[in-house]
Amino acid sequence: MGLLVFVRNLLLALCLFLVLGFLYYSAWKLHLLQWEDSNSLLLSLDSAGQTLGTEYDRLGFLLKLDSKLPAELATKYANFSEGACKPGYASAMMTAIFPRFSKPAPMFLDDSFRKWARIREFVPPFGIKGQDNLIKAILSVTKEYRLTPALDSLHCRRCIIVGNGGVLANKSLGSRIDDYDIVIRLNSAPVKGFERDVGSKTTLRITYPEGAMQRPEQYERDSLFVLAGFKWQDFKWLKYIVYKERVSASDGFWKSVATRVPKEPPEIRILNPYFIQEAAFTLIGLPFNNGLMGRGNIPTLGSVAVTMALHGCDEVAVAGFGYDMNTPNAPLHYYETVRMAAIKESWTHNIQREKEFLRKLVKARVITDLSSGI
């Protein structure tokens, strides 16, 4: 009888030990996962390329780039006729030269924006921290978070980002630009009077308050107005615009801003700030600066738009991109007389780093450069 009691007590003690051990392991594992979740982005920013081997650069891009399609992609697209849209082409080519690339990001913020950790922990321009109420108020009125139904239904989307560079002048690329399904324009770059070189079609116009066109008649019909929020005042400004409230010109802007945008709320979108974050830290390698806006760590709107297009388009092209610092007297933009030397005065952008990033994409045929400025 005593032996049975001893065996029973031994088994109970063993079971208790196993249960405690399991609970301890589970708690440790949960803590580890939580730590990994909260630090994975920072780790990826600090150690990009270090675990990929010597064939990749410090950011994680393939060092030896050429225009030859990888074998599996050459097979996949072998039967496509010249000029036919190739589904998934841009993201597949991007992944081939940059294995860390993935497509988790929607183009625009929707009503689930607070659930996405990648932008929740950063203040503008790299995230939405502190902007919940403003964004919620805007989205409650716009109620549209995607492209138009016609564009959303396309089996394959060909997109072009039209930059503002002087390299567009006298190139006569207008008809080729208009052939794309989605034509993305930036800030206040005009179309009227320049159609021969820049086309007449506009699908999206991405801007921030200081860059937005100030005269209502300049806005194109049938285009979406997309805010790129670089500071909290930008979201406040958009709320004024959407609710048709009075805009104060002294609300923290560095120049005068539009007081009215002739778009109905369903024609207005908020660009997902993840693309600003990804362009800056992951793809271009700008200084992290604790996730805050600082000197030389803000990507140009052109690079942000390219990053967005890599996520949302099957094929991506650009036109009007490229700054040639060796020609300081060349026109900076196709529509004005400001000279190239003016870009050197910018303290927020790192033009050389951006040029290196875009050249990688062009060389590897991830994107097409119609104006050959990159």
Swiss-Prot record:
Residues 1-8 are cytoplasmic. The chain crosses the membrane at residues 9-28. Its EC number is 2.4.3.6. Keywords: Disulfide bond, Glycoprotein, Glycosyltransferase, Golgi apparatus, Membrane, Signal-anchor, Transferase, Transmembrane, Transmembrane helix. Residues 29-374 are lumenal. GO terms for cellular component: Golgi cisterna membrane. GO terms for biological process: ganglioside biosynthetic process via lactosylceramide; protein glycosylation. Pathway: Protein modification; protein glycosylation. Disulfide bonds join 159-313. Optimum pH is 6.4. It catalyses: a beta-D-galactosyl-(1->4)-N-acetyl-beta-D-glucosaminyl derivative + CMP-N-acetyl-beta-neuraminate = an N-acetyl-alpha-neuraminyl-(2->3)-beta-D-galactosyl-(1->4)-N-acetyl-beta-D-glucosaminyl derivative + CMP + H(+). GO terms for molecular function: beta-galactoside (CMP) alpha-2,3-sialyltransferase activity; N-acetyllactosaminide alpha-2,3-sialyltransferase activity. It is a single-pass type II membrane protein. It is an enzyme of class 2 (transferase). Signal peptide: none annotated. Its main location: membrane. Found in all tissues tested. High expression found in brain, liver, kidney, colon, heart and spleen. It is found in: Membrane; Golgi apparatus, Golgi stack membrane. Belongs to the glycosyltransferase 29 family. This is CMP-N-acetylneuraminate-beta-1,4-galactoside alpha-2,3-sialyltransferase. It comes from Mus musculus. The lineage of its organism: Eukaryota, Metazoa, Chordata, Craniata, Vertebrata.
